[in-house]
Regions:
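Conserved small/polar residues in nucleotide/adenosyl-binding loops
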Residues: 227-231
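Acidic helix-start/capping segments at beta-turn-to-alpha-helix junctions
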Residues: 127-144
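Structured segments of extracytoplasmic/periplasmic soluble domains
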Residues: 110-125, 150-153, 171, 199-206
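Active-site acidic/histidine clusters and adjacent loop/turn architecture
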Residues: 80-128
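Bacterial Sec-dependent N-terminal signal peptides
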Residues: 1-33
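Extracellular/periplasmic catalytic domains that process cell-envelope and extracellular macromolecules
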Residues: 126-128, 158-164, 213-216
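Second-shell loop/turn segments in exported
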Residues: 93-105, 132-134, 178-189
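Short, surface-exposed glycine/acidic/tryptophan-bearing loops
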Residues: 142-167
Length: 231
């Protein structure tokens, strides 16, 4: 009888191991991940919350930025003083037509903070992840001339020329897909704009940046302030 039990022991151990392994390999939930929105308020007024005019942006940009560059070749020679801006875990960079993807380090750090805070805020508010999209960064003098030929209202004296200013779209966002392929419910651009406005309002109130709400351009025009140190 005891010998019979001993013969069955390896089989028992094998079955127990298989049960444990199966339990540990629980199938991933592949159902549509829905949004569960909560505490989304936005700001009372975009114009009143983000009123900083170009002169204010320009004054700070001149203090903390680089000297204006004539062309993109000159910008290449300044790489050691600038941070390359490219798609990362916090934000996406648009196809830049009238600017090049460089910022001074403290402005780059602010951009990381905006992207990180936005993702954290979406999670806290029960919304699926999306990244902000950067639509304009450093402009050379040639970039400004080309832009003014296309848009007569564009400023000849742009804060973008100093590498401390960037634009973040409020019209478009980049959806972050689930790494395992689980489908995610979309979040409307209007809702994402509300959340982004809260994030930017808080940073402006903390004196991290100047912000101007651009209606026609569909973006927030942002300049890093002196007291914002790189993280």
């Amino acid at each position: 009888m005891n010998n019979h039990k001993l013969h069955l022991l390896p089989l028992f151990i094998l079955i127990t191991g298989l049960v444990t392994l199966t339990a540990g390999c629980k199938k991933k939930d592949m159902s549509l991940k829905l949004n569960e929105p909560r505490n989304i308020r936005g700001v009372v007024s975009y114009k009143r919350s983000f009123p900083d005019l170009n002169d204010a942006h320009l004054e700070v940009a001149k203090k903390i930025g680089i000297s204006p560059l004539a062309d993109r070749e000159e910008a290449e020679a300044m790489k050691e003083k600038l941070t390359h801006i490219t798609d990362n875990e916090f934000y996406a960079v648009d196809s830049l037509t009238h600017s090049i993807p460089y910022l001074v380090p403290r402005a780059s750090a602010l951009l990381d903070t905006i992207g990180s805070n936005f993702l954290d805020s979406l999670a806290a508010k029960g919304l699926n992840p999306n990244q902000v999209i950067i639509t304009s960064v450093l402009r050379t003098e040639n970039d400004v001339k080309r832009l003014r030929r296309r848009n007569g209202n564009a400023s000849a004296n742009s804060a973008h020329c100093f590498g401390a200013t960037f634009d973040v779209s409020w019209k478009r966002f980049k959806k972050v897909e689930d790494k395992d392929g689980r489908p995610m419910q979309d979040v409307s651009a209007d809702t994402l704009k509300l959340v982004l406005s809260e994030v930017l309002r808080d940073l402006r109130q903390a004196e991290k940046c100047y912000i101007k709400y651009e209606l026609k351009q569909g973006c927030f025009h942002i300049t890093c302030l002196l007291y914002t140190s790189p993280s």
